[in-house]
Amino acid sequence: TNIACGTARLGLKSAVITGVGEEHMGRFIREQLQREGVNTDGVKTDPDRLTALVLLGIRDQEQFPLIFYRENCADMGLTVEDIDPEFIRRARAVVATGTHLSHPQVEAATIKALELARANGQQTALDIDYRPNLWGVAGHGDGESRFVESDAVTAKLQSTLHLFDLIVGTEEEFHIAGGSTDTIEALRAVRTVSKATLVCKRGAAGAAAFTGDVPDSLDDGEAGPGFPIEVFNVLGAGDGFMSGLLKGWLEGEDWPTALKYANACGAFAVSRHGCTPAYPRWEELQFFFERGITRPDLRNDAELEQVHWATNRAGNWSSVRTFAFDHRLQLEEMEGYTLEKGGAFKELCLEAALKVQNGQ
């Protein structure tokens, strides 16, 4: 959902295939997606499962513990029957997350969507997004963990990598996909099973793209400029990065430009609090590129924040009309005032307001 919202903010037409519960959290997610301009035709309401949830903790500037509530959740309940070929046909690209390859049922749905896309000649992308505890190789208390070796996870990922035109991950995520803790070896292992462009995220060092053979150094890949900002909260940075990358990739930009978009969107995410709420719209991103960084803590950049909130207001509120009839001392000072008369007056005000609201 973060990527769907992030790409929509950047001007792409996005949709999401997922599941939510038949409860307030599920309704909130559906409504918020719609507010962001995301097509929700593929969002399934599951009456038997709850919407997935994650709790974020902020321990200090470097540690952000997570607790995932995702066992038998609504989005993991997707089946092949939930994948509509016509809905897939309308897309320009299909983006999958590695977590949805971790369970046979939702994996089958994901593979169906990818195979339909490839049969249609559409682009496909994978965000490896490796969470060891969601693959069952780490405990519930290890939500912050980003890497645990697992031959089974590596084999599962490698069995699907041929389905993608673009594969994106951190060094640790390519370690699990490639089956090696040496990043170059891991990338080369991925290359043996996939012709996809490989984009390796390197944190503060930016990212590198490899369209062909993997060289001896990550520094020899295609790169875009990085942005030196203060890290405030890393949650959602990967989805922000992916949103910017997809904007450039799908609109035919070269890799340095696409990576520039990606690095900037990731920088916005880590220097603000939250995921989707931190992501920029296209106008804000252009303003950021033209003006540059004036302070590393972007959330405290008043000029940038003004652009952010001005371009992310929900709704088109041309005017607000307020009718206040709460108590005022001036009422008590009127000749002949009593509490009973004051109460009756307020009831008349309420009745009039309700009639106006109902168009009477």
Feature names for model-found ranges:
Residues 115-119, 179-303:
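Conserved phosphate-binding/catalytic region of the ribokinase-like
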Residues 13-98, 286-295:
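Conserved N-terminal subdomain of the carbohydrate kinase-like
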Residues 2-13, 56-58, 248-250:
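Alpha-helix C-terminal capping segments
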Residues 93-189, 196, 200, 204-213:
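Conserved beta-alpha-beta core of the PfkB/ribokinase-like small-molecule kinase fold
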Residues 295-360:
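Alpha/beta catalytic barrel-like cores
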Residues 7, 170, 238:
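Short, conserved phosphate/pyrophosphate- and ester-handling motifs at nucleotide-, phospho-/glycolipid
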Residues 13-14, 40, 122-124, 198, ...:
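Hydrophobic anchor at the start of a short beta-strand
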